[in-house]
Amino acid sequence: MDLRVLNPDSEGIGEVAARGKTVMSHYLDDPELTAETIVDGWLLTGDLGRFDSSGHLQLFGRKKNMIVTDGGKNIYPEDIETVFDGLPVKEYCVFAANYIWPAKALGDEMLLLLLRLDQGQEFDEALKQEVVARNRRLPDFKRVGGCVIWDKDFPRTAAMKVKRVALAEEIRKTLSRAAIVEL
């Protein structure tokens, strides 16, 4: 199998593409999706990555999850989420506020940490301070500006990945921007 990184940015990160005898050639009865996914014989995986100096592929996240800041920097929610690993909550994930609640005037994008607390747990001052302390480990442009408390389990795929689109839609229908607890 051959792999390459398409349209790399200044840090060498781009979309991973694959081709080979074991890579799919098309979607059955879906020429439009095939045309979007297979380009010049290369399968566009939707994963973002780069090759390191040893030739190993490093993955950074999914293209559809990437957030572009006002300053033009690319942020991968998965990168930010690793800083919050071990946070004493049931589950969490990072979103751009404007992705959940589209704003008419873009600018000053706020990143949010969506928290699913354990049963009976509250977002108290101790938990807030732990979030703030972990947040300080991130460069300024990657810091979350607030938290949103969510009372339902996150929808997941069979592979246990968060269904971000479905979760954002559910939040949009249920909560407003007023639910953001600023840090």
Regions found by a protein language model. Give the residues of each.
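Thr-Gly-centered strand-to-loop micro-motif
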Residues: V5-L6, A18-R19, I38-D40, L44-G46, ...
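AMP-binding/adenylate-forming catalytic core of the ANL superfamily
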Residues: G20, S25-H26, L48-D140
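Conserved beta-loop-beta connector loops within the AMP-binding
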Residues: M1-R19, R50-S54, P102
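Short secondary-structure edge/capping micro-motifs at helix/strand boundaries
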Residues: L33-T34
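Conserved C-terminal "lid"/linker of ANL adenylate-forming enzymes
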Residues: A96, L112-L113, V132-L183
